[in-house]
Amino acid sequence: MKKIAIFGSRHKSEQGASIKALILKLEEAGTPLYIERKFLSFLKQDLDFHPAICGVIDTLPEHIDYVICMGGDGTFLRTAHQIGVSQIPVLGVNTGRLGFLTDVDCHEASELITRLLDGDFTIETRSLLEVTEDNGSSPSYALNEAAILKRETGSMIRVNACLNDDYLAAYDADGLVVATPSGSTAYSLSGNGPIIMPACRNFVLTPIAPHSLNMRPLVVPDDTVIRLEVDSRSRNYLLVLDGRTRTLPCDTSILLKRAPHTLRMIRLRPHSFAETLRRKLMWGAAVR
């Protein structure tokens, strides 16, 4: 029997019935369940639901076969961070607003979950960024993007970028986003970056509020090694990986490249990125 870990976040009360229906369907099938501690607390306290589980988890155990993420894109990114290098397949169940990364909506999840239990699904792989600081720390990974941002609101920073040791440019801006195809519909898009199909092997460098009008987003092959160095009036800058923020001194440079592993996303039905653009982003819709 396949073991399943469930990660999630607090949801609106009207979604409670759908959440319970999904977990009960897994219980009825005899599926060994491991539920994230914070999410289990929500189920018990807010929904008065006490599922039969094999264990309470804070991090993802190695023996898990599948992961189910119940939430929006933020919860999905947090779950992807938990999966790390293990490449355990993850199913995203959307209980948030946009849910661009999630596969199924909450109200239909209990009907489709049988396909997961029967092995009737496909796997879609997504590329990841590997981010290394030159201070000798271990690599970190991001599904969507790595963003270098200024720490002080009143001044810009300068981000010097090199591609495969070839100097590219100095970005005088509020920051610089390096996004994967998955992240091209996230922070990068708000900076007028292009949308990149998930199967494309590219990264996009998107400046945030650049001082120069000719500093446009740039698409590069994902076998490119990107080196970023920061110059700022402040002694520090922010490095943000899929919403996880840390402060670094300006003398710390960043190396970005394609990670050697991928994120494996479970698709319970035929998936069309074009349909996702139309449905989630109102692509081509005549909105008046």
From Swiss-Prot:
GO CC terms of this entry: cytoplasm
S-S pairs: none
Chief location bin: cytoplasm
Binding site for NAD(+): 73-74, 78, 144-145, 174, 185-190, 209
Gene3D superfamilies (UniProt xref): Probable inorganic polyphosphate/atp-NAD kinase, domain 1 (3.40.50.10330), Probable inorganic polyphosphate/atp-NAD kinase, domain 2 (2.60.200.30)
GO molecular function: ATP binding; metal ion binding; NAD binding; NAD+ kinase activity
Active-site residues, record numbering mapped to chain: 73 (proton acceptor)
SUPFAM superfamilies: NAD kinase/diacylglycerol kinase-like
GO-annotated biological processes: NAD metabolic process; NADP biosynthetic process
Catalytic reaction equation(s): NAD(+) + ATP = ADP + NADP(+) + H(+)
Keywords, comma-separated and alphabetical: ATP-binding, Cytoplasm, Kinase, NAD, NADP, Nucleotide-binding, Transferase
Domain of life where this protein originates: Bacteria
Family affiliation: Belongs to the NAD kinase family.
Function noted in UniProt: Involved in the regulation of the intracellular balance of NAD and NADP, and is a key enzyme in the biosynthesis of NADP. Catalyzes specifically the phosphorylation on 2'-hydroxyl of the adenosine moiety of NAD to yield NADP.
NCBIfam families noted in UniProt: PRK01911.1
Protein name: NAD kinase
Biological source species: Porphyromonas gingivalis (strain ATCC BAA-308 / W83)
